[in-house]
Regions:
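Active-site-adjacent bridging/hinge elements
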Residues: 182-191, 268-275, 290-291, 376-387
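Activation targets extended, charge/polar-rich intrinsically disordered C-terminal tails
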Residues: 95-103, 125, 130-203, 213, ...
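N-terminal signal peptide c-region/cleavage motif recognized by signal peptidases
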Residues: 16-18
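Auxiliary, metal-adjacent structural segments of Zn-dependent hydrolase domains
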Residues: 22-95, 154-158
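Glycine-rich catalytic cores of cysteine/serine-nucleophile enzymes that process amide/ester linkages
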Residues: 78-86, 91-114, 274-365, 605
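Bacterial N-terminal signal peptides that target proteins for export
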Residues: 1-8
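Second-shell loop/turn segments in exported
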Residues: 29-38, 95-110, 197-202, 283-287, ...
Length: 646
């Protein structure tokens, strides 16, 4: 065989081999100088190098890139309907500036992000489906055609009508801030309420813009993995790839403690390695119209430092945290109309469990049930990530009927765990949601079967109403008091109760002390209600003392907003705060907390001044009774030979 025949054969064989399909960015050089062409080509090479291999191989076409004079001044670039990328010609001068290295660097960074952004749009519009996804989409489309929306399996919600690669993926929409509306068979919310600490507010305009903006940060920002860990994991899984220069993350998630207890740290970190379990925490219903179906929360069972994860972590109650969606009410009066029409923000409060237990069992006299959720380690980790993300970004709208605590909690469980069993659960009440979770095997209520055991192990926190009745039964067994029910005893005036305070033995006196403390708490609640009614009656009437008090009250309510919206404490950055923002967070949270405590002290003084003399006397008499009982208990203890601490 001659060299000519051999060469021809090789050439024919090469023609038969499949070409390597991949994206090619081709500069349109018309009208550009040599310097401009060189700078533009370098930009395209850098953009191409930053893209995931999967994206490059799927976008297997020539994408023309052209500098355009037709774009508005504020538009840096745009992907055209024909598949080309247009860059604003006005930005070219800064890219080629030889006398300003800073301007050139800033321009290159902006143009690089723009190129990635527009290529992300092209990729999203391409509706690229992986080999693993294809059977699911085919099956879901077939089932929707035969069964319709009503009979569609949970795993098919949002899959059958897919038109894009990423921006209509149900998983991405959950993480991004377009969750499913309750009772709408998969229809998504129109508005994205994860608006705080956004890297670019343009991402909130639509899911397609969200994808483009976040692909910019996924590819170009080394901190993205730490600031938006759930979304980083989503893109990494989609592309089976991650950028090489990803920053190492701390592994724990920062949060702001919504408690104003001075003994508590204002800032904390949730370490997933210390979270043993997640419980559905239910406050029982009461007669108040806003609480008649209970209140749903999530309890994080956090182990004490050094304790291995296990059942004993249930004993570390002082470490446990509560995730509670609540309406942020910037007024003393809770309005049913405002609650029905969505005039209250819905926010995720993070509170110590001990405070939540006191709030419900002692003040509201409502019991709490803590039911373990059946989550695996991956679901638990995802839930913690999403809760932290919502804590720093979410400012929703609270509706008492269709976007209340139960709905918000269910949406968090869906987006955090990605458990498809949750997708077709529908409930707008806390008790109803618990029943559904139990019915699907996601909640284990067997821990409540033995009430005494449940109380000892921390699965049930009884209302103090029952405890008060037990204490009162002790009193009635030793003293001939005039009341039969504890409510009647607490309703007596402090001076009437004082007649019986010096008659009991040590056990009876201890019971009387607990009841007197309960009576004082009840009195303070009555004072709060009386002051609210007086305040509302005299508001806007020109009452001099009230005007000053009203101004302070409004300021206090407005200033307390940061407790549920911690993003207010930071002026820059996005997503979860990082180490370089921690010092600013500590300083500002400390200053704001002290300011609130000072205002609250001043407000208490002014409000007490508005009380009538009879109510003030009742409060003082209650304090006196508590002091007398405490002293008598010490005397009886000494007389009985009890241990004395010196």
């Amino acid at each position: 065989m001659s060299w000519f025949e051999r060469g021809l054969l090789i050439w024919l064989l090469l023609l038969c081999l499949p070409a390597q399909a991949e994206l090619r960015l081709v500069l349109q050089p018309a009208g550009l100088s040599e310097l401009q062409r060189s700078a533009s080509q370098a930009l395209l090479v850098e953009a191409r190098r930053s893209l995931p291999p999967v994206l490059v191989s799927r976008l297997d076409s020539v994408v023309p890139v052209r500098w355009s004079t037709a774009l508005d001044a504020e538009v840096v670039g745009r992907a055209s309907a024909t598949g080309a990328v247009l860059l604003n010609y006005d930005r070219l001068a800064a890219l080629t500036a030889v006398d300003s290295e800073g301007a050139q660097k800033a321009s290159r960074k902006l143009l690089l992000a723009t190129l990635v952004h527009e290529l992300a749009h092209l990729y999203d519009r391409g509706r690229y489906v992986s080999r693993e996804q294809h059977p699911l989409l085919q099956d879901c489309q077939s089932q929707q055609q035969s069964l319709g929306l009503i009979g569609l399996p949970a795993r098919c919600r949002g899959q059958a009508e897919r038109q894009f690669t990423l921006s209509d993926d149900p998983r991405l929409l959950d993480l991004a801030g377009w969750p499913e509306q309750m009772g709408e068979r998969g229809a998504r919310e129109v508005t994205n309420h994860q608006r705080d600490r956004s890297p670019d507010s343009y991402e909130l305009a639509s899911p397609s813009e969200f994808v483009a903006v976040n692909l910019e940060y996924f590819l170009l920002d080394p901190q993205y993995a730490c600031r938006r860990p759930a979304l980083f994991a989503y893109f990494r899984q989609h592309f089976s790839w991650a950028p090489a220069d990803v920053q190492a993350c701390s592994g724990s998630y920062p949060y702001l403690n919504a408690s104003l207890d001075p003994s508590q740290q204002a800032l904390g970190r949730i370490d997933p390695e210390r979270v043993y379990a997640v419980h559905y925490l239910l406050a029982e219903p009461n007669e108040a119209w806003a609480s008649r179906w209970g209140h749903s929360m999530l309890r994080l069972v956090v182990c004490a430092p050094g304790r291995p994860r296990g059942p004993d972590c249930m004993l570390d109650v002082d470490q446990h945290l509560v995730l509670s969606f609540r309406a942020f009410v910037e007024d003393v009066q809770l309005s049913s109309w405002d609650g029905l029409t969505g005039n209250y923000p819905s926010r995720l409060f993070i509170l110590p469990l001990t405070q939540v237990v006191d709030e419900y069992t002692k003040l509201e006299l409502r019991s709490l049930s803590s039911i373990p959720l059946q989550l695996n380690a991956q679901e638990r980790e995802g839930l913690l990530q999403q809760a932290a993300q919502l804590h720093w970004s979410y400012d929703g709208t609270y509706y008492f009927i269709n976007n209340n605590c139960a709905v918000e909690t269910l949406k968090l469980l869906r987006s955090g765990t990605a458990n498809t069993t949750l997708r077709n659960l529908e409930s707008i009440t806390p008790t109803g949601l618990l029943a559904l979770l139990e019915g699907r095997g996601l909640a284990d209520d067997s821990v409540l079967a033995d009430r005494d055991w449940a109380m000892r192990r921390g699965y049930f926190f009884d209302s103090f109403r029952e405890r008060y009745q037990v204490m009162f039964d002790v009193v009635r067994a030793h003293l001939k008091v005039p009341s039969e029910r504890v409510e009647d005893w607490l309703a007596l005036g402090a001076q009437q109760r004082a007649n019986w305070l010096n008659m009991g033995d040590q056990r009876t006196t201890a019971a009387l002390l607990l009841l007197e403390q309960a009576a004082q708490r009840r009195q303070l609640l009555l004072v709060r209600q009386e002051l609210k009614e007086r305040y509302l009656a005299l508001r806007d009437t020109g009452h001099a003392e009230l005007n000053q008090t009203e101004q302070l009250m409004r300021q206090l309510l407005a200033e307390s907003g940061y407790l549920s919206r911690p993003a207010e404490l930071l002026t820059a950055g996005y997503g979860l705060p990082q180490a370089d923002e921690w010092q600013q967070l500590q300083q500002r949270s400390s200053e704001r907390r002290q300011g609130l405590l000072d205002m609250a002290g001043s407000l208490d003084e002014q409000l007490l001044a508005l009380l009538d003399a009879e109510r003030r006397d009742e409060i003082e008499a209650g304090k006196h009774n508590i002091s007398l009982l405490a002293e008598r208990l010490r005397e009886l203890h000494r007389a009985g030979g009890g241990l004395q601490l010196r």
